[in-house]
Amino acid sequence: HNSASVLTPAGATPWKGAMSKDISVTLNTEGVYVYECTPHKMMAMVGVIKVGSATNLDKIKQNSQNYKRAFVMNKDRLDKYLSEL
């Protein structure tokens, strides 16, 4: 597994961790971040982080529509996570 950012607030620094290695990320830009396990993207192995206010939530939801096309399992997982913000 790894952790890699896929959708971030404007101006945020993206990250991509190496396979099977720990990663530490400092998030300094307010908003919603979506990250994935790159080799397991098709299974919707994703997560969501909210830093401060969800100032970019509408943009993330819009951009996630195209991103989710790669999911073959758990197709509603990201929508569920975003709905909890």
Model-inferred region functions:
Residues H1-L85:
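Extracytoplasmic copper-binding redox domains, predominantly the cupredoxin/blue-copper superfamily
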